[in-house]
């Protein structure tokens, strides 16, 4: 009986452990990015105040940009890692999940590049002696608008990725189903509130649920691994 239960565990632990460790690192980096982010609603009439605010918090902005640079690269690698983890189970949805995850990482790379551009513009503007006819405020405003749009699109891609990956767990039980349902709920909130009300308590709750699902996902992959349900069907436990 013990041998049959043991045989139901997926043996591809060399892939599962790094995937789990990667997901755990990403979850903690997401938390750090939330704690260091600067929320600005771009308004051209207040752009000079925004530039002053960004200059006062330039170190925090740099830290946030570097966190997202590292996290974006890790998210890109998480895509193929998820594919290699779940493809042996014969699920084609793992292709879609891997594509969406890597696409989210690429989008966050663009977001990070935008953040570094904002930092450069802020430094150049503050260094000016005469700012009367400077084009930098207009450039900064456009960069802030782009930053906001990239963030909203990233919320949507994150939500779709969470729903696709969560549905895989919820339907198959390769990982505990509660992780799948947490991922689905967090993903739905990301999509529904990311564009319209990202400052609401509901969206904050959705982010907490999503990060916890990612942390549980990584922990189970790292410590226990997936469960191969096919072997249980082919070789049902003896009474």
Descriptions of predicted regions:
Residues 2-239:
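Hydrophobic, aromatic-enriched alpha-helical segments typical of multi-pass transmembrane helices
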